[in-house]
């Protein structure tokens, strides 16, 4: 499972989170293209590499072409609702703005529909929040953890005058979240940052056990006595004990295409491109279409954030003029790859677990084929020996076979 850890040693804000996502690998041009779906032309977006206490980070700037446009929650809901953003991005963005609205309404003692957003309703906050949701979606992050949040101290100037730090709306949003303040003056955690982190994160504490793949630093505007950075670590969640881990549940998309007029020789290249682009599975089935024409049903399973690329490949590399897309639920056993040594050489074996026991042992085909070609021995013989060696290895560990 792809996970992220937010290290909030200098607080969290929407622009810092967006900068951290870009620094961790979110394509900035793709982000701009996605945000264009909001149909807002009152801002310019650019990135800048900066140093904070000697640490390089990415700073995101949202330059408003007009003054602050104050909006009600219903205005923001309308902008997001009519946008060209993916449904899951719309849903999460609306959830975050609703959280903000409820917090502001409680602080001001009024109804959420009467709340008149100030900075939160400005274009920079909209871009920061929707951009962060796009970033988590594009990077395929399924679970988010965070450290206790450094909120700062003192007072901050707002539309209503001087407010204590953390601002009342921020503190309301962080109810139940571990926070702290040290000798750093100023507002470190903002309402948009608090709304985003509490919408995604349910666990606040030390670093989880994660196989690190990417690290990004998002820079704040101010120069502080500590590095004004938000650190984002992205990687695969490493379970304490794969043998005890439960069945994983996930979501994906299925793309289907009916094809009756394509050269069958092209499918090999098509499969290769789809898998290289990140498809989870690709297969074809023989079907009978109208006028009794033989055809194939091409099916592609993909993560949500790969939809655009899969769609482009299918339209580019096949003869279809249309495709079907629908969401699916996936249930998967946890597994790990073992390396076993045989008389023929080393090979990898995929071992799946259920309720603390190894239940499936599958030698990797490519390794078996390589050893068969290398030794001249029958493929099936090599396959069986590798499988037996893997079982012996499992018997000698804490993962017995069923």
Swiss-Prot record:
UniProt cross-references to PANTHER family, sorted A to Z: NICKEL INSERTION PROTEIN-RELATED (PTHR36566), PYRIDINIUM-3,5-BISTHIOCARBOXYLIC ACID MONONUCLEOTIDE NICKEL INSERTION PROTEIN (PTHR36566:SF1)
Superkingdom: Bacteria
Entry's family note: Belongs to the LarC family.
Role summary: Involved in the biosynthesis of a nickel-pincer cofactor ((SCS)Ni(II) pincer complex). Binds Ni(2+), and functions in nickel delivery to pyridinium-3,5-bisthiocarboxylic acid mononucleotide (P2TMN), to form the mature cofactor. Is thus probably required for the activation of nickel-pincer cofactor-dependent enzymes.
Reaction(s) this enzyme catalyzes, per UniProt: Ni(II)-pyridinium-3,5-bisthiocarboxylate mononucleotide = pyridinium-3,5-bisthiocarboxylate mononucleotide + Ni(2+)
Keywords: Lyase, Nickel
Species of provenance: Desulfitobacterium hafniense (strain Y51)
Keyword Transferase: no
Name recorded for this polypeptide: Pyridinium-3,5-bisthiocarboxylic acid mononucleotide nickel insertion protein
This protein's encoding gene: larC
Example GO molecular function: nickel cation binding
EC number(s) per entry: 4.99.1.12
Annotated GO biological process: protein maturation
């Amino acid at each position: 499972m792809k996970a992220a850890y937010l290290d909030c040693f200098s607080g969290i804000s929407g622009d810092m989170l967006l900068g951290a996502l870009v620094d961790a690998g979110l394509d900035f041009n793709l982000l701009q293209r996605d945000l264009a779906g909001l149909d807002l032309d009152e801002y310019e977006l650019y990135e800048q590499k900066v140093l904070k206490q000697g640490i390089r980070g990415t700073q995101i700037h949202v330059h408003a072409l007009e003054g602050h446009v104050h909006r009600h929650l219903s205005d923001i809901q309308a902008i997001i609702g009519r946008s060209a953003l993916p449904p899951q991005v719309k849903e999460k963005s609306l959830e975050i703005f609703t959280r903000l609205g409820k917090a502001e309404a409680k602080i001001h003692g009024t109804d959420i529909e009467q709340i008149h957003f100030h900075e939160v309703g400005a274009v920079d906050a909209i871009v920061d929040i929707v951009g962060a949701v796009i970033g988590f979606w594009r990077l395929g992050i399924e679970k988010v953890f965070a450290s206790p949040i450094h909120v700062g101290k003192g007072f901050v100037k707002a539309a209503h005058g001087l407010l204590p730090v953390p601002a009342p709306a921020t503190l309301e949003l962080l109810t139940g979240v571990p926070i702290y303040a040290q000798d750093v003056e100023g507002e470190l955690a903002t309402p948009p940052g608090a709304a985003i982190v509490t919408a995604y994160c349910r666990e606040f504490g030390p670093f989880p056990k994660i196989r690190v793949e990417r690290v990004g630093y998002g820079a704040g505007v101010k120069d502080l006595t500590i590095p004004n950075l938000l650190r984002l670590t992205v990687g695969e969640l490493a379970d304490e004990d794969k043998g005890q881990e439960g069945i994983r549940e996930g979501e994906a998309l299925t793309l289907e295409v009916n094809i009756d007029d394509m050269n069958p020789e092209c499918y090999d290249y098509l499969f290769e491109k789809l898998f290289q682009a990140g498809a989870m599975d690709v297969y074809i089935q023989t079907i009978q279409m109208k006028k009794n024409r033989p055809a194939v049903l091409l099916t592609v399973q993909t993560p949500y954030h790969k939809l655009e690329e899969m769609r482009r490949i299918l339209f580019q590399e096949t003869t279809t003029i249309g495709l079907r897309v629908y969401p699916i639920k996936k249930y998967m056993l946890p597994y790990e790859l073992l390396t076993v040594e045989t008389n023929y050489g080393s090979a990898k074996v995929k071992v799946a677990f259920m309720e603390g026991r190894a239940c499936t042992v599958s030698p990797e085909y490519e390794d078996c084929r390589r050893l068969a070609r290398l030794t001249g021995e029958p493929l099936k013989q090599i396959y069986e020996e590798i499988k037996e060696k893997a079982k012996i290895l499992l018997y000698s560990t804490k993962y017995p076979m069923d």
